[in-house]
Amino acid sequence: MRIANKSEAVDYAYQTAEPQKQGWPLTAQEQEYILKPEFQRRPGSEKNKYLPNLWPIVPSAGFWEGRKWLDTHAQMVNHVQANTGSVDILLVGDSITQQWNSPLDVGKFNTAWQKHFGHYKTINLGIGGDKTQNILWRLDHGGLESIDPRLVILLIGNNNMFFTPETGVDPVANGIQMCVVNLREKFPKADVILVKIFPAHAPGNRFYEDIKQTNIALDKLHLEIDPKVQVLDLTSDLINLDGALKPALFLQDKIHLDQDAGYALYARKLKPLVEKSLRVKPAANDNKTISKQ
């Protein structure tokens, strides 16, 4: 795999009509484009083509009503640019990552993170609702040139399950792979821990079964053949022998982890992989997790 300079764009399978393919700040033309609902910006939409197999692997900005998603991303870019230089851990993902807590939330990381990783300088770039394509867009428009993480922890794909009736599961696995490729190209010195999608809902539920099949498809990509990539699968820790979720580990929505038991387990399982990657002392002099000022 060719490792590019941070400022270079990753080669994608399809080029949309997006006016600014990378970089920050955004031009007025780019802002106008990405404030359109996401379905209007999907690959092929500009040619009136239906290409759902490309949705998970081609960058697309996320969308909440109005400017909320873009404003959230902009706050994260500002946070990254205020914390330049060496960083121990960069967290990338959706709401499950965000709920380690982030600079946009309660101002400090949750109890499990602080217990196991609080001495590491950490930036959390988790945004609720994000899919693989949104992560790709954020990585290309995130002002990340100013930081140098030693380790990136990526968990993404859960929200892609809402669209697997159209996309299928293999493109989602390919989208996760593209996120890893993007991270490896932007941060060639960093290790990557890829966390496989957590089970959700119940056996027999489409969401549950599509997650299972996506993780199987991900296994077939053998991403861990790259010596700087580790893959973590918590499925067996999160379910009972009959496949049902362990209720103590999840919230009532059967998607998100319980802030106490769920994240405590997640942190314990992450810790050996983190310690393997961060073999020397934490970066920077303050040696602490970055939180909201």
Residue ranges and their predicted role:
Residues L91, D130, N134, T167, ...:
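Extracytoplasmic/secreted proteins, especially bacterial periplasmic and envelope-associated proteins
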Residues T84, F117, F187, I225-D226:
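A structural signal for short coil/turn segments at secondary-structure junctions
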Residues P199-Q293:
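Catalytic His-Asp segment of secreted/periplasmic serine-dependent ester chemistry enzymes
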Residues L70-V80, D130-G142:
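A Trp-anchored, charged/polar loop motif used as the substrate-binding/catalytic surface
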